[in-house]
């Protein structure tokens, strides 16, 4: 089966890679790659989504940072309040740099013969 994807973004690249592993032929249509570098952007991936992605992208968790606690400080005049998320130290999500994630998925996509640009 042949699938056409529009756009050369993270979602399209992940979808193309996963479908190619299931023996679909993929064509990705996009304009020239944007020269924007998002070296300060990060993504938060939940534990369940990371587990799913690791079925297709080996060792992805090695490139992530585990976040198990978030503290928010609210300063409003005389009131200083701190909100703590996840006092149980359960993994909330994993952070990965956007450009690093794109590099990983583009490398995987470029190795697949059934994905065309």
Predicted segments with their positions:
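Glycine-rich FAD pyrophosphate-binding loop
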Residues: 4-8, 17-41
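Conserved N-terminal helical subregion
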Residues: 65-117
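N-terminal FAD cofactor-binding segment of flavoenzymes
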Residues: 37-75
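N-terminal Rossmann-fold NAD(P) dinucleotide-binding loop
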Residues: 12-13
């Amino acid at each position: 089966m042949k699938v056409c994807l529009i756009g050369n973004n993270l979602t399209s690249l992940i979808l193309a890679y996963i479908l190619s592993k299931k023996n679909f032929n993929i064509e990705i249509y996009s304009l020239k790659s944007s020269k924007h570098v998002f070296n300060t952007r990060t993504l938060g991936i939940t534990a369940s989504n990371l587990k799913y992605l690791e079925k297709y992208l080996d060792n992805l968790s090695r490139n992530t940072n585990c976040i198990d606690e978030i503290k928010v400080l609210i300063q409003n005049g005389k009131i200083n309040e701190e909100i703590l998320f996840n006092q149980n130290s359960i993994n909330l999500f994993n952070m990965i740099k956007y450009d690093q994630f794109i590099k990983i998925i583009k490398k995987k996509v470029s190795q697949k013969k059934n994905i065309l640009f």
